[in-house]
């Protein structure tokens, strides 16, 4: 009990510190300028490209990529196992993962289960652990997404992928363990059919859903987690118990990227499809006004907040809180993002200035794995690994 009390006091102290720090220098800063093209201490490096051939059988599609990334995937899978075993030292949870999760196959939609089987085979990681690795992303995605329209009606979509909160803190270098281990797993993917691009995405090797992507010339899509009491854990439990009329959110976003042929079709599917976990879908199109944040409960859409430049709404910003509510006081990335967009102005929004906004603390923080910039009309899709050197807020 004394140990637990000590942990509680440490967490309380950290929370109070973050509450104060997030709104005061040096953990926040004036809006950054001239950070693009990426360089300097907040730039970790470029993200490699791989082609995923959709003409191959699903079992074989990921083999080339996973041969390269198997060693780093094993590192993060082992880290997650160690964290679980720390809380449940008996090892029974991992025993259930390894023995029971593969029995759920036959219940996943489309090609996803064959793809996961193929990844397990080529990496020599138990199939149950590959499945749990894919479930993992339904629960811990903490992000900032923005769609902005310039004075000419041109759209730019930007996002920071923040991931790994409370999943192990490295006291030696002040970083989140899982966040750092995800960086070498980050890949750009060119999904092709008949040697032609169907869509492009940034993802983590071993994950067959999609969190960030675009269909050149048509639309862009990012996914943010939505915290809710009626949340992902409940949805996963219901799914395990046999309720199969819902879609995994990462599988839905991939299905939309792969099959939808217009902004409106994508919006319709993202608005109406029953999903496993609450989420925000941030969607951008190819013409003026085509940008929105879809706030989803598991069964229905609660809100579709759209661009309306004529009414002065030339951007939409989404973090992980409903737009009509105040962000959690320990985690307000929305306010600084909006402040920097307003200072940038519609006249000056561009790839360069969008990167500036996403490089400003605390929009950029210790959880940030990568930043993506998308221009649907020009076919530009750029992803950069990020660092947030001290002093930098933990989230």
UniProtKB/Swiss-Prot annotation:
The record marks 162, 320, 333 as: Important for catalytic activity. Belongs to the acid ceramidase family. It is an enzyme of class 3 (hydrolase). Optimum pH is 3.8-5.0 for the hydrolysis of N-dodecanoylsphing-4-enine. Optimum pH is 5.5-6.5 for the synthesis of N-dodecanoylsphing-4-enine. It comes from Homo sapiens (Human). This is Acid ceramidase. Its EC number is 3.5.1.23, 3.5.1.109, 3.5.1.-. Induction: Up-regulated by Ca(2+). GO terms for biological process: cellular response to tumor necrosis factor; ceramide biosynthetic process; ceramide catabolic process; fatty acid metabolic process; keratinocyte differentiation; regulation of programmed necrotic cell death; regulation of steroid biosynthetic process; sphingosine biosynthetic process. It catalyses: an N-acylsphing-4-enine + H2O = sphing-4-enine + a fatty acid; a beta-D-glucosyl-(1<->1')-N-acylsphing-4-enine + H2O = beta-D-glucosyl-(1<->1)-sphing-4-enine + a fatty acid; a globoside Gb3Cer + H2O = a lysoGb3 + a fatty acid; a globoside Gb3Cer (d18:1(4E)) + H2O = a lysoGb3(d18:1(4E)) + a fatty acid. InterPro entries: Acid_ceramidase-like (IPR016699), Acid_ceramidase_N (IPR029130), CBAH/NAAA_C (IPR029132). The active site is at 143 (nucleophile). Changing residue 333 to C: In FRBRL; uncertain significance. Changing residue 173 to Q: Loss of ceramide catabolic process. GO terms for cellular component: extracellular exosome; extracellular region; extracellular space; ficolin-1-rich granule lumen; lysosomal lumen; lysosome; membrane; nucleus. GO terms for molecular function: fatty acid amide hydrolase activity; hydrolase activity, acting on carbon-nitrogen (but not peptide) bonds, in linear amides; N-acylsphingosine amidohydrolase activity; nuclear receptor binding; transcription corepressor activity. Lysosomal ceramidase that hydrolyzes sphingolipid ceramides into sphingosine and free fatty acids at acidic pH. Ceramides, sphingosine, and its phosphorylated form sphingosine-1-phosphate are bioactive lipids that mediate cellular signaling pathways regulating several biological processes including cell proliferation, apoptosis and differentiation. Has a higher catalytic efficiency towards C12-ceramides versus other ceramides. Also catalyzes the reverse reaction allowing the synthesis of ceramides from fatty acids and sphingosine. Broadly expressed with higher expression in heart. PANTHER family: ACID AMIDASE (PTHR28583), ACID CERAMIDASE (PTHR28583:SF1). Changing residue 97 to E: In FRBRL; decreased ceramide catabolic process. It is linked to Farber lipogranulomatosis: An autosomal recessive lysosomal storage disorder characterized by subcutaneous lipid-loaded nodules, excruciating pain in the joints and extremities, and marked accumulation of ceramide in lysosomes. Disease severity is variable. The most severe disease subtype is a rare neonatal form with death occurring before 1 year of age. Switches substrate specificity upon intralysosomal accumulation of glycosphingolips. Such is the case in Gaucher disease where the regular catabolism of glucosylceramide (GluCer) fails due to the lack of GBA1 activity, its accumulation triggers the alternative catabolism by acid ceramidase which deacylates GluCer producing a free fatty acid and glucosylsphingosine (glucosylsphing-4-enine, GluSph). Similarly, the intralysosomal accumulation of globoside Gb3 in Fabry disease due to an inactive GLA triggers its alternative catabolism by acid ceramidase, generating lysoGb3.
């Amino acid at each position: 009990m004394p140990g637990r009390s000590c942990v509680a006091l440490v967490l309380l102290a950290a929370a109070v510190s973050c509450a104060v720090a997030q709104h005061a220098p040096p953990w926040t800063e004036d809006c950054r300028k001239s950070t693009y093209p990426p360089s300097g201490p907040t730039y970790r490096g470029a993200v490699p490209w791989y082609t995923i051939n959709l003409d191959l059988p699903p079992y074989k599609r990921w083999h080339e990529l996973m041969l390269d990334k198997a060693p780093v995937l094993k590192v993060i899978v082992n880290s997650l196992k160690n964290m679980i075993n720390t809380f449940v030292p008996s090892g029974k949870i991992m025993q259930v993962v390894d023995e029971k999760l593969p029995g759920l196959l036959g219940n996943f939609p489309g090609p996803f289960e064959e793809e996961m089987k193929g990844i397990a085979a080529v990496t020599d990681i138990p199939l149950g652990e590959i499945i749990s690795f894919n479930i993992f992303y339904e629960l811990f995605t903490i992000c900032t997404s923005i769609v902005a329209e310039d004075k000419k009606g041109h759209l730019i979509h930007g996002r920071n992928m923040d991931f790994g909160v409370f999943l192990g803190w490295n006291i030696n270098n002040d970083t989140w363990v899982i966040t750092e281990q995800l960086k070498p797993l980050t890949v750009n993917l060119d999904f092709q059919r008949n040697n032609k691009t169907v869509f492009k995405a940034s993802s983590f090797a071993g994950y067959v859903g999609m969190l960030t992507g675009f269909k050149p010339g048509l639309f862009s899509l990012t996914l943010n987690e939505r915290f809710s009491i009626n949340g992902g854990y409940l949805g996963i439990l219901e799914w395990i118990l046999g309720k199969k009329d819902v879609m995994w959110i990462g599988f839905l976003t991939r299905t939309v990227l792969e099959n939808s042929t217009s902004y409106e079709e994508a919006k319709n599917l993202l608005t109406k499809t029953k999903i496993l976990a609450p989420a925000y879908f941030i969607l951008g199109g190819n013409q003026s006004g085509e940008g929105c944040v879809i706030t989803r409960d598991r069964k229905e859409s609660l809100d579709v907040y759209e661009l309306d430049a004529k009414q002065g709404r030339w951007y939409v910003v989404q973090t992980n809180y409903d737009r009509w509510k105040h962000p959690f006081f320990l985690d307000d990335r929305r306010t600084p993002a909006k402040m920097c967009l307003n200072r940038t102005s519609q006249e000056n929004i561009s790839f360069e200035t969008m990167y500036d906004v996403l490089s400003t603390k605390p929009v950029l923080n210790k959880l940030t794995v990568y930043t993506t910039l998308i221009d649907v009309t020009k076919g530009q899709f750029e992803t950069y690994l990020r660092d947030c050197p001290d002093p930098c807020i933990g989230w």
